Regions:
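Juxta-kinase regulatory segment immediately upstream of eukaryotic protein kinase catalytic domains
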Residues: 1-27
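ATP-binding pocket architecture of kinase catalytic cores
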Residues: 28-207, 211, 215-218
Length: 220
């Protein structure tokens, strides 16, 4: 919903400011299709510095949604995304894009945003959902299994992060519950209630909630 010409001009000026290089330039934007639908994602390249000190990077700008965009979450917290990515980079060897800059104000582009380095790879699409079609749907069973195992491995690494400090307090859900699992479950139910507040129900999801509550693990 943002004007790409205006964004390019404003981001060009901002890059000069954050790099401290008056010759910093950025390329035209490439907008990924089929994924990243919760907010605007812009792919571009930037160059700054001179001669042997020249820096060239492939970058991604992630913009918070505007007030005119259809909300996907009750509250869109861009800062939490940045904090999570930085924690994962610091505490694991998971390949996560390095966040270079964060702009919390709306003075530059009209919405908060951050800029990170690109990580090369293939992203399963949201449109259509990858379970209905696309490169992952068409992949061989062996390739699908490999992606599944890699995803489970990444999730396992994330759960091995034991560090508890004021830097991780933002990860706690504010829902009631004696354990992290109970609070997570309560948070998901709250999100579901927000999604269906217009009157559209999802019986399968509600049945799943009921099943989980009646089969709750003794250790959670």
């Amino acid at each position: 919903s943002l004007d790409p010409v205006t964004i390019h001009a404003d981001l060009s000026e901002w890059i000069i400011k954050v790099t401290g290089e008056t010759n910093a330039i950025i390329s035209e934007f490439d907008r990924p299709s089929g994924s990243g639908m919760s907010s605007e994602t812009l792919l571009f390249e930037s160059t700054w510095g001179e001669a042997e000190n020249e820096v060239h990077k492939k970058l991604v700008a992630r913009l918070a949604p505007t007030d005119q965009d259809i909300p996907v979450f009750p509250n869109y917290n861009l800062s939490s995304q940045v904090k999570v990515m930085k924690l994962v980079e610091q505490l694991t060897d998971i390949k996560v894009p390095k966040v270079l800059w964060e702009e919390a104000s709306i003075d530059v582009l009209g919405v908060p945003f951050f800029v990170m380095e690109q990580v090369q790879g293939r992203v399963p699409p949201d449109i259509p959902p990858y379970v209905f079609g696309g490169w992952l749907f068409d992949a061989t069973p062996e390739s699908q299994l490999r992606l599944q195992e890699l995803c489970v491995g990444i999730i396992a690494q994330l759960h091995q992060i034991k560090q508890k400090s004021p830097d991780t307090d933002f990860l706690e859900f504010h829902t009631k519950g004696d354990t992290a699992l109970v609070r997570h479950f309560a948070n998901q139910k709250e999100y579901y209630r927000w999604v269906v507040q217009g009157g559209r129900q999802h019986p399968v999801i509600e049945q799943a909630f009921d099943w989980l509550e009646s089969h709750w693990p003794e250790e959670s």
